[in-house]
Swiss-Prot record:
PROSITE patterns, per database record: P_GLUCOSE_ISOMERASE_1, P_GLUCOSE_ISOMERASE_2, P_GLUCOSE_ISOMERASE_3
UniProt keyword terms in alphabetical order: Cytoplasm, Gluconeogenesis, Glycolysis, Isomerase
Stored Gene3D superfamilies: 1.10.1390.10, Glucose-6-phosphate isomerase like protein, domain 1 (3.40.50.10490)
Organism from which the protein derives: Paraburkholderia phymatum (strain DSM 17167 / CIP 108236 / LMG 21445 / STM815)
Subcellular compartments: Cytoplasm
InterPro entries listed in its UniProt record: G6P_Isomerase (IPR001672), G6P_Isomerase_C (IPR023096), Phosphoglucose_isomerase_CS (IPR018189), SIS_dom_sf (IPR046348), SIS_PGI_1 (IPR035476), SIS_PGI_2 (IPR035482)
Short name of any one Pfam family annotated for the protein: PGI
Catalytic function, reaction form: alpha-D-glucose 6-phosphate = beta-D-fructose 6-phosphate
Protein name: Glucose-6-phosphate isomerase
GO CC field: cytosol
Top-level class of the enzyme under EC nomenclature: isomerase
Catalytic residue list: 350 (proton donor), 381, 503
Name of the encoding gene: pgi
GO function terms (MF aspect): carbohydrate derivative binding; glucose-6-phosphate isomerase activity; monosaccharide binding
Length: 540
C-alpha cells in the first residue's frame, strides 16, 4: 500500500482542510486555552531535552492522526529493525548501526570491537593531550588538523566548536574539507609542522577532496623540513580501508578503524570523532556517547505519542506534505551551536532527499525539505524579515540553551529573550487594528507595511546546559527524526547515490582542463564553453 493511500494519510488530508485556516493566536487566547494549556499538553521531555510543540499548527487530533500514520507506515518496525542490526540499507546491503557505537549493552555482537577501538582512541588522545606524543623535533602537539569532507568533517567540526569550553587550551583543532586550496592554505598560515598532527579521515581513503588535501599537507611537511622517515609522528588515518591508509604512508599502528555499517553522516561517534576525543578528552567523549544513548533508549521505549523523534519527524511531514512547505529553518540561539545547521543540512537532505521508494518505484509526494539556518540573534538581522512578512511559511526549530557555558552571563537573558520573543511574534503576528494603533492617524499608509500575518509555526527545543551529554542527545534526536521521516516516505535514508554522478563527470572534466587538446563533442555546449574559459585562465 502506498503512502498516500494509507487511511491515516487520507484522514490527515481531510483534517488539514478543517484546520488550515485556524489561527494559533485564537488557540492561545485564554478563553480557548484552559488547563491543561496547550503549552502543558504539547511540551514533552526525553533524553534530557524538552521540546515545546505548542506553537505549531496542530491540535490533539492532529497528533493522533500523525501518530496513526507513523504506525501505519511501520515506523516502529523499521526502528526496531535498525537497532537489531537488520539490513535497513538495502541498496548497499548494509546494516545501520551507528547506535551500536554508543550502546552500553555488552551482549551486542559489536560491543567488543567498538570498545576496543574506543580504548585505542582514548589511549592515543591521552598521549597527545599530555604531551607524551611529540613531533619530529620532540615538541608536543599543539595543532590538530582534521582532513575530511561530508560526515568526516561536518560532525566533528560541529561538536568541537560546540564544546570548545570543555576543550584543552593546549591544542587548537582545525578542519580542512574543501578541495579549494584556499581552505588548506588558510590553516597552513596558523600552524607549524613541528607541533602539528594531521588526522586523515576517509572511509575509502580515495575521496578526491580528502586525498588532495592530505597529499598537499604531506608535501608541506617535507618542504618545511620534516624527514619522510618521521612523517608517521604527524599523520594518523581513520578509514574502513586500512591497506590504502598504509599505502599513503601512515604507520599501521596509527590507523583507526571505521566500519561500513556506519554511514558517514552518522559517524562522529566512531573513530571519525578522534579530533573530538583529542579536543575534549576521553571522559567527555564518553559523556557525548552517553547522551546519544539516552536518546536512543527514549526513541526505542517511549510510546509514539510521547516520543520526541517521532513527533518531530511527523510534525515535519505535516508541514512538508500537507501545508506544502519547501524548507525548514534551524535557529540555534547559541553561538556554540554555530555549525549545527550545516551539520543538519547533510543529515536531513543527504538522507531523505530521495525520489525512489524502497521497492524501486518513484515517490508521488515530496520528501526532504530544504534545511537551512544560522545562529540567533544573527539571523534576525538577515532573513527573519522574510520569515515574519514573506508569503512563504517556513517552519522553524529554535534551539535554546538555558544556562551559558561562558562567564559573560549578563548577555544570556538578552539572548533567551530574543529567542522566545521571536517564537511569540511569529505566532501572534500583528493585526490591521494593532498596526493602525502603532502607525497612528498621521501615517495610515504605513499600516500594510507593519502588519504581520502571524500563524508561523515554530518548535522550541530547550537544553538546560550545553554539555557533552546534552549535545549527544540533541544530535541523536535529529538522527532518529530522519529515520522516522524516511520510513514514512518509504525511502532509504542511509545511502547517497545522488553524489555519484557529479563525481564521475568531475573526473572527465578535470582531465579535459589539463589535457593538451579537448574533444568539444564530449560535453554539451555550455560545459564545453566553461571548460574552454577555464583552460585559457589556467594557462595565464
Amino acid at each position: 500500500m502506498t503512502l498516500n493511500s494509507l487511511p491515516a494519510w487520507n484522514s490527515l488530508q481531510t483534517h488539514y482542510g478543517q484546520i488550515r485556516d485556524a489561527r494559533l493566536r485564537d488557540w492561545f487566547a485564554p478563553e480557548n486555552d484552559p488547563a491543561p494549556t496547550r503549552a502543558e499538553r504539547f511540551t514533552l521531555s526525553g533524553g534530557g531535552l524538552a521540546a515545546d510543540f505548542s506553537k505549531n499548527r496542530i491540535t490533539d487530533d492532529t497528533l493522533k492522526l500523525l501518530v496513526q500514520l507513523a504506525r501505519e507506515a511501520q515506523v516502529e518496525t523499521r526502528r526496531d529493525a535498525m537497532f537489531a542490526g537488520e539490513t535497513v540499507n538495502p541498496t548497499e546491503g548494509r546494516a545501520v548501526l551507528h547506535t551500536a557505537l554508543r550502546a552500553s549493552n555488552p551482549t551486542s555482537p559489536f560491543y567488543g570491537k567498538v570498545q576496543a577501538e574506543r580504548a585505542k582512541m582514548a589511549a592515543f588522545a591521552d598521549k597527545v593531550r599530555s604531551g607524551e606524543w611529540t613531533g619530529y623535533t620532540g615538541k608536543r602537539i599543539r595543532h590538530v588538523v582534521n582532513i575530511g569532507i561530508g560526515g568526516s568533517d561536518l560532525g566533528p567540526k560541529m561538536v568541537v566548536h560546540a564544546l570548545q569550553h570543555l576543550a584543552t587550551p593546549e591544542i587548537s583543532t582545525h578542519f580542512v574539507s574543501n578541495v579549494d586550496g584556499a581552505d588548506l592554505y588558510r590553516v597552513l598560515q596558523q600552524i607549524n609542522p613541528e607541533e602539528t598532527l594531521a588526522i586523515i579521515v576517509s572511509k575509502t581513503f580515495t575521496t578526491l577532496e580528502t586525498m588532495t588535501n592530505a597529499n598537499s599537507l604531506r608535501d608541506w611537511f617535507i618542504q618545511k623540513g620534516c624527514p619522510e622517515s618521521e612523517l608517521a609522528k604527524h599523520f594518523v588515518g581513520v578509514s574502513a580501508n586500512p591497506a590504502e591508509v598504509v599505502k599513503f604512508g601512515i604507520a599501521q599502528e596509527n590507523v583507526f578503524e571505521m566500519w561500513d555499517w556506519v554511514g558517514g553522516r552518522y559517524s562522529l561517534w566512531s573513530a571519525v570523532g578522534l579530533s573530538i576525543v583529542i579536543a575534549i578528552g576521553p571522559k567527555q567523549f564518553d559523556e557525548l556517547l552517553a547522551g546519544a544513548n539516552e536518546m536512543d533508549e527514549h526513541f526505542r521505549s517511549a510510546p509514539l505519542e510521547r516520543n520526541l523523534p517521532v513527533l518531530m519527524g511527523m510534525i515535519g511531514i505535516w508541514y512538508r506534505n500537507f501545508f506544502g512547505s519547501q524548507s525548514y529553518l534551524v535557529a540555534p540561539y547559541s553561538e556554540a551551536l554555530h555549525f549545527l545547521p550545516s551539520y543538519l543540512q547533510q543529515l536531513e537532505m543527504e538522507s531523505n532527499g530521495k525520489q525512489a521508494c524502497l521497492d524501486g518505484s518513484f515517490v508521488t509526494y515530496d520528501t526532504s525539505a530544504v534545511t537551512w539556518g544560522e545562529p540567533g540573534t544573527n539571523g534576525q538581522h538577515a532573513f527573519f524579515q522574510m520569515l515574519h512578512q514573506g508569503p512563504t511559511i517556513v517552519p522553524i526549530d529554535f534551539v535554546a540553551v538555558l544556562t551559558p557555558e561562558h562567564p559573560l552571563v549578563s548577555h544570556h537573558p538578552k539572548l533567551l529573550a530574543n529567542c522566545f520573543a521571536q517564537s511569540e511574534a511569529l505566532m501572534l503576528g500583528r493585526t490591521r487594528e494593532e498596526a493602525e494603533k502603532v502607525a497612528g492617524r498621521d501615517k495610515p499608509d504605513l499600516v500594510p507595511h507593519i502588519m504581520f500575518p502571524g500563524n508561523r509555526p515554530t518548535t522550541t527545543l530547550l537544553v538546560d546546559a550545553l554539555t557533552a551529554r546534552s549535545l549527544g542527545a540533541l544530535i541523536a534526536l535529529y538522527e532518529h527524526k530522519v529515520l522516522v521521516q524516511g520510513t514514512v516516505w518509504n525511502i532509504n535514508s542511509f545511502d547517497q547515490w545522488g553524489v555519484e554522478l557529479g563525481k564521475i563527470l568531475g573526473k572527465v572534466v578535470e582531465a579535459d582542463l589539463t589535457a593538451a587538446t579537448v574533444d568539444e563533442t564530449k560535453h554539451d555546449s555550455s560545459t564545453s564553453a566553461l571548460i574552454a574559459r577555464a583552460r585559457a585562465a589556467l594557462k595565464r
